[in-house]
């Protein structure tokens, strides 16, 4: 006679719902406990809902365009038109994500952004400030390192991997992040003529970026690098990821001028325009049309997926002086804080600030070059001050910047008496 009691005792059960191994599709073993696949799914759903609730509470609503611009004003000087354009685009994008309206009669597409402006005009800083304001994952990618799949270089999927890493590998959080692709103008089509060699870092990369910009489920290798058949992939939906592309687009103003000059005619009835040398790049960029980007080398599908275009102006000397002193993280304030830790006051005269701005313009580095100029100007001071006794104030004037002479050091009275 068979022993049924021993057979029943060998059947394993889920420690949570009590289902036997025969009733469950999968039973996962732990230290003296078991859990079935249905309980795992239920636990995942509870965690997912909890995360979603926490995210909603943390977000507390999307800032209005005016609030977004006000925050950008605290960190970025000038560029009002670009700020307004970005504020509206970002507001509409995240408002679209927050909307619970799932009706199929109106589908709002995402507003990816193309920022065009010279080096050091604030493109990267604007994107970074937006991500910090919205408290979303953010990553910066250099488009020049990207190549088509199968060629030496970075795969496009690595952009999503970096965003995932910025989100602490939280897929849902990454799917609401911001990607900034810099130097996008460097992947313009090299030539209109067909060639026997493949353009793997130009048009090929534009084609590869299309799906990520528009929205797709990307298969991302969790450890990065190239894809392997045996590797497990993370599935990331890029539909709700805001993509901001930026580039200097040097020479684009010539394309705009060439296109616009065709509409003015020739002869006695022609409209008289100023000489192109007298027209600033800023004015020409305001006349930008999609056909100009096509002529520059971007493919039609790529231009069509970047509906919002924000143009940034070349920074004037006055704007660069304001950048040195006004933002919350202004460079002058940072160096003043560093010397304040040594109980020394750092003072810049108006002439010194103007000289720094003028040198940045001459180097064509914009605001990005200001830090390097300040570093070289203050190097000796930062080296010597910790060892000098009794220094109360350091004054930087125009001659210190232009001629690299010693700055004026003001000592405390008691230090002067001791030296006497």
Curated annotation (Swiss-Prot):
GO annotation (BP), single: cell division
Molecular-function GO terms, alphabetical: ATP binding; ATP hydrolysis activity; ATP-dependent protein folding chaperone; protein dimerization activity; unfolded protein binding; zinc ion binding
GO CC terms: HslUV protease complex
PROSITE patterns: CLPX_ZB
SUPFAM superfamilies: Glucocorticoid receptor-like (DNA-binding domain) (SSF57716), P-loop containing nucleoside triphosphate hydrolases (SSF52540)
Keyword line: ATP-binding, Chaperone, Metal-binding, Nucleotide-binding, Zinc
Binding-site positions, ATP: 118-125
Zinc among keywords: yes
Pfam families: AAA_2, ClpB_D2-small, zf-C4_ClpX
Residues reported in the UniProt entry to bind Zn(2+): 14, 17, 36, 39
InterPro entries tied to this protein: AAA+_ATPase, ATP-dep_Clp_protease_ClpX, ATPase_AAA_core, Clp_ATPase_C, Clp_protease_ATP-bd_su_ClpX, ClpX_bact, P-loop_NTPase, Znf_CppX_C4
Residues covered by the ClpX-type ZB domain: 2-55
UniProt record similarity statement: Belongs to the ClpX chaperone family.
Subunit structure comment from the entry: Component of the ClpX-ClpP complex. Forms a hexameric ring that, in the presence of ATP, binds to fourteen ClpP subunits assembled into a disk-like structure with a central cavity, resembling the structure of eukaryotic proteasomes.
Database matches in HAMAP family: ClpX
Function: ATP-dependent specificity component of the Clp protease. It directs the protease to specific substrates. Can perform chaperone functions in the absence of ClpP.
PANTHER family, alphabetized: ATP-DEPENDENT CLP PROTEASE ATP-BINDING SUBUNIT CLPX-LIKE, MITOCHONDRIAL, ATP-DEPENDENT CLP PROTEASE ATP-BINDING SUBUNIT CLPX-LIKE, MITOCHONDRIAL-RELATED
Protein name: ATP-dependent Clp protease ATP-binding subunit ClpX
């Amino acid at each position: 006679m068979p022993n049924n009691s021993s057979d029943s005792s060998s059947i394993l059960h889920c420690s949570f719902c009590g289902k036997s191994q025969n009733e469950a599709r999968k039973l996962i073993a732990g230290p003296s406990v078991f859990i079935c696949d249905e309980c795992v799914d239920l636990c995942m759903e509870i965690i997912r809902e909890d995360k979603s609730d926490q995210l909603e509470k943390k977000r507390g609503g999307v800032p209005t365009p005016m609030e977004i611009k006000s925050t950008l004003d605290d960190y970025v000087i000038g560029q009002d038109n670009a700020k307004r354009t970005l504020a509206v685009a970002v507001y509409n994008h995240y408002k679209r994500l927050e909307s619970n309206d799932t009706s199929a009669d109106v589908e709002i597409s995402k507003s990816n952004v193309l920022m065009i402006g010279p080096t050091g005009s604030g493109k990267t800083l604007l994107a970074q400030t937006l991500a910090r304001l919205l408290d979303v994952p953010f990553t910066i990618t250099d488009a020049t390192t990207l190549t088509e799949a199968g060629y030496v270089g970075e795969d496009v999927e690595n952009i999503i991997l970096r965003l995932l890493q910025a989100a602490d590998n939280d897929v849902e959080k990454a799917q609401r992040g911001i990607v900034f692709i810099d130097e996008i103008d460097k992947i313009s089509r090299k030539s209109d003529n067909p060639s026997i060699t493949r353009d793997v870092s130009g048009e090929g990369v534009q084609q590869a970026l299309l799906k990520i910009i528009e929205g797709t489920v990307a298969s991302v290798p969790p450890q990065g690098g190239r894809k392997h058949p045996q590797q497990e992939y993370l599935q990331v939906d890029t539909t709700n990821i805001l993509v901001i592309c930026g580039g200097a687009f040097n020479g684009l103003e010539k394309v705009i001028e060439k296109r616009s000059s065709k509409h003015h005619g020739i002869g006695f009835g022609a409209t008289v325009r100023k000489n192109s040398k007298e027209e600033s790049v800023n004015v020409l960029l305001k006349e930008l049309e999609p056909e100009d980007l096509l002529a520059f080398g971007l493919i039609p599908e790529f231009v069509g997926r970047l509906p919002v275009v924000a143009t940034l102006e070349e920074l004037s000397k006055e704007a660069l002086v304001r950048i040195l002193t006004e933002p919350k993280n202004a460079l002058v304030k940072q160096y003043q804080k560093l010397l304040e830790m040594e109980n020394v006051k750092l003072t810049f005269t108006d002439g010194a600030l103007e000289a720094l701005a003028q040198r940045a313009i001459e180097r064509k580095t914009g605001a990005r070059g200001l830090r390097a100029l300040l570093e070289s100007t203050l190097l000796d001071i930062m080296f010597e001050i910790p060892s000098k006794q009794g220094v109360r104030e350091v004054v930087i004037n125009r001659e210190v910047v232009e001629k690299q002479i010693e700055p004026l050091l003001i000592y405390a009275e008691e230090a002067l008496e001791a030296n006497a």
